[in-house]
UniProtKB/Swiss-Prot annotation:
GO terms for cellular component: host cell; host cell nucleus; T=1 icosahedral viral capsid. GO terms for molecular function: metal ion binding; structural molecule activity. The keyword Metal-binding applies. This is Capsid protein VP1.
Length: 729
């Protein structure tokens, strides 16, 4: 029998199976992402040829897709292919869109988990006519640029982009490009375009992988700042400062700026409860991919008041006022995530929202003289001064970040940021040290049905194996395990620093059956109308306590150190219980201060908290990095997405005094639209167990939590994020 014919290798580059001309389409699995893109490109060319088209002499949609997929390639083959097809795009004629072989074979995209999987998504509405006119004009003038920069490269971008070129009401073009990490679009009064989209798309990629594309849009209201200056403000204690109340300490120094921060770094900005149900019930792992945001449809108005009594307010469009926009692509300014203060953009897409005022901590010297525990009634002596001159770091946005000036109808785009983070598990672990490894061999098994009839074990001194107690008693309590799941953490401990005392953070874990929240790092959330409180309520702020699902918590009140029958030394030469004093100080016990963290400690990551939790965080610039952050499950290995700042430019009057720090201003405010896209990849869960599992669902009793009241009131409830169990060992 003749040997099988060899597969045509063509002129592929060394180390690749598909990157190069002339190869066959059955070379096996691609060697890297660039090779995978080349395989898809070859398959598209094959379809062109079978349909009677010649893709080699025309620039096609497949070529454009290959360019996008290799835009950030680091391998040499991907770079060569990327620039080859960019050159082809510049010189070769183009195939029409109807010639694309991929128009009828798109992957399945589910727009929203709220729709039945079998329902047909609504068709796209045709774009307005003026968009095609604008694109044609932009193409003719050669101003169509793309921007897909990675702010994690820590290199400031100075290439301007046009987020969109628009026509003014008179038909003349106006506006211009911007610089820095983003760009401003050519604007024009009367022709403002954009889209309002809060859908979540689930694209199933095969082999258990899903791409989640979350869209968010908000109408943002921005008032002019109360002042145009930077202010260094000392904050002193507003609460009592007597002994035993140091948890009330508030003293610090902050720099208050005239700028506002647009922060979308919270789960509730991107997902609704139905989205989160689909993710938590079906995904076992998730990771961040990319993030981009845009400001568009800027409207600036001025307010004047009549001299009548009562005065009448008159609102006018101001076509010359400016909205200042700054994107800190290099993370030059202090990083101030707003989720821990519940000041991100609001969670309800149909409600207008507002950005928070940008401010940051400044170095200060905190002198503290608390009384001893024997002088409980003495007053704490404290004071605060400006920090050491060697520690002062005063930043202004005006000289640290490029600023773009937008007028009515203009828009601004940040470009695409690509994350570098570790995947996050959406499952919880139930195994503790008592559940790792092989259980002890039973002496007898029950013969009568019912849990009240247990099995029995051999005597503790007759069991075989090894443990770490130097006696012959081998019990489940003394059995050796491969590692330590969780650890005993000192809790409610306040360390002192130059800035004052602070509560030492604790890795959040699930409670034990004794419900010891504080020893296990439970997080307390407080929120207002925009972030979960009942929107029609005037009562106190909404609050809840969040405990993760993974079972690695401790119950310090139930722990003990025991001597007999073990050879252990302890304080009282006997049993040391939580009630025993240390150093003569009551209400302190050994387990409160014991830290068992070590090289054998095994930990789970910080759990995501929907809707109020922070999503990503900036890595601390220290030589020794923490393994986890308490505030967010994703920690960016390089710089995080740049912070986005906005401010209404000073709208001055003719009454100007250069010797005065504050000038008379025309009262100006702005409404503009913000939208963003946050992309994830996720792994779908597989069913390997016999028993069904607990899942997030609604009941007849709790469905009212997710729908408005008769007068429009609605609130957001925290949702579990790690319901699916997993084994550790």
């Amino acid at each position: 029998m003749a040997p099988p014919a060899k597969r045509a290798r063509g002129l592929t580059l060394p180390g690749y199976k598909y990157l190069g001309p002339g190869n066959s389409l059955d070379q096996g699995e691609p060697t890297n992402p660039s090779d995978a893109a080349a395989k898809e490109h070859d398959e598209a060319y094959d379809k062109y040829i079978k349909s009677g088209k010649n893709p080699y002499f025309y620039f096609s949609a497949a070529d454009e897709k290959f360019i996008k997929e290799t835009e950030h390639a680091k391998d040499y083959g991907g770079k060569i292919g990327h620039y080859f097809f960019r050159a082809k795009r510049a010189f070769a004629p183009k195939l029409s869109e109807t010639d694309s072989p991929t128009t009828s074979q798109q992957p399945e995209v589910r727009r929203s988990p709220r729709k039945h999987p079998g329902s047909k998504p609504p068709g796209k509405r045709p774009a307005p006519r003026h968009i095609f006119i604008n694109l044609a004009k932009k193409k003719a003038k050669g101003t169509s640029n793309t921007n897909s920069n990675s702010m994690s490269e820590n290199v400031e971008q100075h290439n301007p982009i046009n987020a969109g070129t628009e026509l003014s009401a008179t038909g003349n073009e106006s506006g211009g490009g911007g610089g820095g990490g983003g760009g401003r679009g050519a604007g024009g009064v009367g022709v403002s375009t954009g889209s309002f989209n809060n859908q979540t798309e689930f694209q199933y990629l095969g082999e258990g992988l899903v791409r989640i594309t979350a869209h968010a849009s908000r109408l943002i209201h921005l008032n002019m700042p109360e002042h145009e200056t930077y202010k260094r403000i000392h904050v002193l204690n507003s609460e009592s400062g007597v002994a035993g109340q140091m948890v009330q300490d508030d003293a610090h120094t902050q720099m208050v700026t005239p700028w506002s921060l647009i922060d979308a770094n919270a789960w509730g900005v991107w997902f609704n409860p139905a989205d989160w149900q689909l993710i938590s019930n079906n995904m076992t792992e998730i990771n961040l991919v990319s993030f981009e945001q845009e400001i568009f449809n800027v409207v600036l108005k001025t307010i004047t008041e009549s001299a009548t009594s009562p005065p009448t307010k008159i609102y006018n469009n101001d076509l010359t006022a400016s909205l200042m926009v700054a994107l800190d692509t290099n993370n030059t300014l202090p990083y101030t995530p707003a989720a821990p203060r519940s000041e991100t953009l609001g969670f309800y897409p149909w409600l207008p929202t507002k950005p928070t005022q940008y401010r940051y901590y400044l170095s200060c010297t905190r002198n503290l003289n608390p009384p001893t525990y024997t002088g409980q009634s003495q007053q704490i002596t404290d004071s605060i001064q400006t920090g050491l001159h060697s520690d002062i770091m005063f930043y202004t946005i005006e000289n640290a970040v490029p600023i773009h000036l937008l007028r009515t109808g203009d828009e601004f785009s940040t470009g695409i940021y690509h994350f570098d983070t570790k995947p996050l598990k959406l499952t919880h672990s139930w195994q503790t040290n008592r559940s790792l490894g092989l259980p002890p061999k039973l002496l007898t098994e029950p013969t009568t049905e019912g849990d009240q009839h247990p099995g029995t074990l051999p005597a503790a001194n007759t069991r075989k194996g090894y443990h770490q107690t130097i006696n012959n008693s081998y019990t489940e309590a003394t059995a050796i395990r491969p590692a330590q799941v969780g650890y005993n953490t000192p809790y409610m401990n306040f360390e002192y620093s130059n800035g004052g005392p602070f509560l030492t953070p604790i890795v959040p874990t699930a409670d034990t059956q004794y419900n010891d929240d504080e020893p296990n790092g439970a997080i307390r959330f407080t929120m207002g109308y925009q972030h979960g409180q009942l929107t029609t309520s005037s009562q106190e702020l909404e609050r809840y306590t969040f405990n993760p699902q993974s079972k690695c918590g401790r119950a310090p009140k139930q722990q003990f150190n025991q001597q007999a029958p073990l050879n252990l030394e302890n304080t009282n030469n006997g049993t040391l219980l939580p009630s025993d004093p240390i150093g003569g100080k009551p209400n302190m016990h050994f387990m409160n201060t014991l830290n068992t963290y070590g090289p054998l400690t095994a930990l789970n990551n910080t759990a995501p908290v929907f809707p109020n939790g922070q999503i990503w965080d900036k890595e601390l610039d220290t030589d020794l990095k923490p393994r986890l952050h308490v505030t967010a499950p994703f920690v960016c290995k390089n710089n995080p997405p740049g912070q986005l700042f906005v401010k209404i430019a000073p709208n001055l009057t003719d009454d100007f005094n250069a010797d005065s720090p504050q000038q008379p201003r025309i009262i100006t405010y702005s409404n503009f639209w913000w939208k963003g896209t946050l992309t994830f990849t996720a792994k779908m869960r597989s069913s390997n167990m016999w028993n069904p599992i607990q899942q997030h669902t609604t009941t007849a009793e709790n469905i009212g939590n997710y729908i408005p009241t008769n007068i429009g009131g609605i609130k957001m409830f925290p949702e579990y994020s790690q319901l699916i169990p997993r084994k550790l060992y």
